[in-house]
Amino acid sequence: MKLFLHSRVWKLLQKQQTATGEHYSLDIRYLDKMVADIAVHAGNYPVQFDSAADRRRAVADLILLSGMLEIVVNGPTPDGGLLLRYARLNRFGHNLDIPGATDKAEGSFKRLLAGQPDNPEANYEYGLFLASSGQAALAISYLEKAISLGVSEASYALGMSYLALGDRQKAIVQLQEYQRYHPKDGNV
């Protein structure tokens, strides 16, 4: 398993010298690489790590990343892409039982969707968050919207949400739909 070490998080900050002085920016590709690495292990509940040490490193990285992004997204008009990444990280933090991550994920997804109600990824990930938080009934509308916006992966979470609510027929329909687009996925 490859997890990023806490000290490498600082590679996110890029410093450039300009005519007006130093300018700092985020290396989005590196950020996405780190988020994707954490997602492999904490994107779903229960989380899966090879060791307790790997989990501790992921928690430390996630807390640091979330804190860095929190500064950027707390302005009056945050970048939607960064707000989605922040919400996603806190969704993972929720899965890792990090204090405060649940509220941060919830607030970030709501804020993002208030400004971008047709954002396919935001609808999908908020639906995943709600479903994994024991709120399957609330997850359904977001997952349905994600599907209508082209996110075929949402069919699996929607099927599982229907199953959690005891609606076996709708669950089967959604899981079959998911399987149609993802025939090699052994989870169905």
Language model features by range: what are they?
Residues 1-22:
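Extreme N-terminal leader/anchor segments
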Residues 22-51, 77-94:
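Amphipathic alpha-helical repeat scaffolds of TPR domains
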